[in-house]
A protein has these predicted regions:
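N-terminal leader/linker segments that initiate helical-solenoid repeat arrays
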Residues: 24-54
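Short helix-capping/linker turns of helical repeat alpha-solenoids
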Residues: 31, 47-48, 61-65, 77-79, ...
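Alpha-helical adaptor scaffolds
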Residues: 41, 106-136
Length: 210
């Protein structure tokens, strides 16, 4: 597999970037830093795929979506770690929900390689991960969860998508209001009041999380 596609998700890195992180760099910094990401990209160029997988995975678990995309590519190819289509799909879907557009086609390619039960389990894991992120106050996961319900289920769940877009709108997340209004036309009128009340309750709860 050609890894030129990895460059699609490379971040805009600071000037005079140092590839190796300082020894005292905190783990929280390592999981989100451009230095770690750049080191992983360099590892791919050097064909040190195992090191690249380890670094991308570290950042993928911290919801760094470009790292998730690159990790999905590596897991799909089986370089640096045994090929695993289900894990690759999990990270490709995660990357797409986080705004990495090339992950959409990658996800479609991987889906064709998996049975229905594996797709179901992967969807469940995505949903649980997003809900866990929301529970600890990660508001960026609100839009991702709404998009998950709108696009990644076997059949769209417009009601749940509307619920979470509504909450994201109240927090003024980018694109949430437009997405909410677009989805609303697909929701039965008799359900709107109930969904809006649920959204208000969840919003109040999330507002208490610092």
């Amino acid at each position: 597999m050609c890894f030129k596609t990895l460059i699609i998700a490379v971040r805009v890195l600071p000037y005079l970037l140092v590839l190796m992180a300082p020894a005292n760099l905190a783990l929280s910094d390592i999981t989100t830093s451009n230095m770690t990401f750049a080191e992983a990209v360099q590892a791919v160029k050097d064909k040190n795929y195992r090191h690249a997988v380890n670094l991308f995975e570290l950042q993928a678990n911290a919801a760094q979506h470009d790292a998730q995309y690159n990790l999905a590519l590596l897991l799909k190819s089986g370089k640096g770690r045994p090929r695993n289509y289900q894990q690759a799909l999990y990270w490709a879907w995660s990357a797409y929900l986080g705004g990495i557009e090339p992950a959409k086609n990658l996800s479609k390619d991987i889906m064709s390689l998996l049975p229905d039960d594996a797709l179901k389990l992967t969807r469940k894991k995505i949903e649980e991960t997003l809900l866990d992120r929301i529970d600890i106050g990660d508001k960026s996961a609100l839009m991702e969860l709404a998009l998950f319900y709108e696009e990644l289920l076997e059949e769209p769940n417009f009601e749940e998508a509307y619920l979470w877009y509504s909450i994201a709108s109240a927090f003024l997340l980018e694109g949430a209001i437009i997405a909410r209004d677009e989805v609303e036309v697909s929701v039965e009128m008799k359900l709107i009041v109930e969904l809006q009340n649920r959204a208000s309750e969840i919003f109040d709860t999330l507002s208490t999380i610092k």
